[in-house]
Amino acid sequence: MRTANGGPRARASPSASPADPGLPEGSERTEMRMRQMCGGSETQGPAPSQQGGRGSNACCFCWCCCCTCSCLTVRNQEDQRPQRASHEIRTDIPACEESPTPTLEEVCAWAQSFDNLMVTPAGRNAFREFLRTEFSEENMLFWMACEELKREANKSTIEEKARIIYEDYISILSPKEVSLDSRVREVINRNMVDPSQHIFDDAQLQIYTLMHRDSYPRFMNSTVYKDLLTSLAEKTVEA
């Protein structure tokens, strides 16, 4: 019988057999090799899973759009919470304020001063309707949002509403950005670190003055105001 090297294999002497009881022969050697091979593959088996584990952990720190790990799922859910809250707060300003039909005396008083117009919901509604025709309704919306903010007392709500107002009307990236001078913007930017309900007071005053000097005179000569005044005058005559 030849060895694996091709040479003749020495016969095992009776005295050597007790010393080599554990050496496998024939099919036993083949079986042991198979076990070693299987055992090697089993020991190497966990490596891909560990590598995969490292991949999933690394995935948590990437920003690829294909990532579906649970870490980013939680992060996405957290990112959506303020968006939902922002949407709920944004609906606080209705498209039109609830108000009774103004009287002829009220509408005539709007022509006497801008304050008389802005103090009543009906006056603000009519003015907003006019501002829409000039594509400048954001001025009134900003002013109204500031009025709401000043009525808030809860700190977290104040911070959230201040952030929304900033994003909607102060940010240069917003399509509804209002016209403010650089000094007022700088003050707002500094105070956004810890906003109060009066953070936009200077900006609100600037926009109020802008509407008073620029939009209000045109409103008084607009069809929106004149048609409302005429309809109320006719109803008064009929009565």
Curated annotation (Swiss-Prot):
Chain ranges passing through the membrane: none
InterPro entries per the UniProt record, alphabetical: RGS, RGS_sf, RGS_subdomain_2
Keyword check for Cytoplasm: yes
Domain of life: Eukaryota
UniProt-listed GO biological process terms: G protein-coupled receptor signaling pathway; negative regulation of signal transduction
Biased composition, class Low complexity, residue ranges: 8-19
Localization (cell): Membrane; Nucleus; Cytoplasm
Pfam family of the protein (one): RGS
GO molecular function: GTPase activator activity
Function summary: Inhibits signal transduction by increasing the GTPase activity of G protein alpha subunits thereby driving them into their inactive GDP-bound form. Binds selectively to G(z)-alpha and G(alpha)-i2 subunits, accelerates their GTPase activity and regulates their signaling activities. The G(z)-alpha activity is inhibited by the phosphorylation and palmitoylation of the G-protein. Negatively regulates mu-opioid receptor-mediated activation of the G-proteins.
Protein's UniProt name: Regulator of G-protein signaling 20
Source organism per UniProt: Mus musculus (Mouse)
Lineage: Eukaryota, Metazoa, Chordata, Craniata, Vertebrata
